[in-house]
Amino acid sequence: MNVDFDALFIPDGHDKIVLIAPQLAFHDVSGVRLLGSSGWAHEDLTRVGRGDVRSAVMAALFHPESRYPFVANFVDGFGTHFAAVPDVFAASAYDAANLILVQLAAGHDSRASVSDGIAGVRGYPGASGVTSFLQDGNARKRPFLLGVKGRRLIALD
C-alpha cells in the first residue's frame, strides 16, 4: 500500500506496539519508520516484535549501554557495588543526589541557596542524561535515542 508519510509516531507502550507493527506489514505498508516514546524501551519490543520493529526509533529516559562516558562510569560503579544493571530510577536518584552534593561543595549551606544553585545548572552530564534547569525551575533533559538492531536496543546518539 502506498502511503504519503515517512514516519508513524505511536505514543503507547511496547506491549501495544508489538500488536500494531505487524498490522502495517499485513496491510503492505512499507518504508514507514516507527517512532515511539520511552514506553517502547523494553526488551520485549525486540523479542516479540522482531522484524516488524526493525526500523523503530524511540526516546528513552535512561539507557545503560549508552556510549556517553558519564553514563558508562555510573553503570560500571553501580554494577561493582550492587552486582546489577541500574534502571532509570537509580540513575535519576544518583543525579539528584550529585546535584545537591555539588551545591553543598560549592558552599551553598541553606535550602534557598542550594535551590538557587541548582536552578543555575546548565548542561549537567548525569547518569540519566544531560540536564539543564529552566527559569521556572523545571528540568530539561535530552532523551536518549534508541533504535533496534537485531534483537537489541542500541544507542543512536
Identify the residue ranges that each predicted region occupies.
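Extracytosolic ligand-binding ectodomains
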Residues: 1-157
